[in-house]
């Protein structure tokens, strides 16, 4: 194996380019929206299954969704947030519930 470490040389990068290369990824909030039809127990199940909340925290978030109209389930990188939104929405449809999960930039 070659001991050439020229690929580690960042001197050729401008300071702005280096800063851009090291910039942390954009983060996105995953949000559950309230509706008048999805059972509270199903919302708790979703929060436990897809966001790994214990029953107490899942219940608190479900009540936030119910009384305030929405709740932030977590903040993730774009790919993780998009995946969670897609999985939650698919799971809700498979179980004949109109529960809506969305994302927005944090």
UniProtKB/Swiss-Prot annotation:
InterPro entries cross-referenced by the UniProt entry: ClpS (IPR022935), ClpS_core (IPR003769), Ribosomal_bL12_C/ClpS-like (IPR014719)
GO biological process: protein catabolic process; proteolysis
Assembly behavior: Binds to the N-terminal domain of the chaperone ClpA.
PANTHER family according to UniProt: ATP-DEPENDENT CLP PROTEASE ADAPTER PROTEIN CLPS, ATP-DEPENDENT CLP PROTEASE ADAPTER PROTEIN CLPS1, CHLOROPLASTIC
UniProt similarity note: Belongs to the ClpS family.
Described function: Involved in the modulation of the specificity of the ClpAP-mediated ATP-dependent protein degradation.
Full protein name: ATP-dependent Clp protease adapter protein ClpS
Gene from which the chain derives: clpS
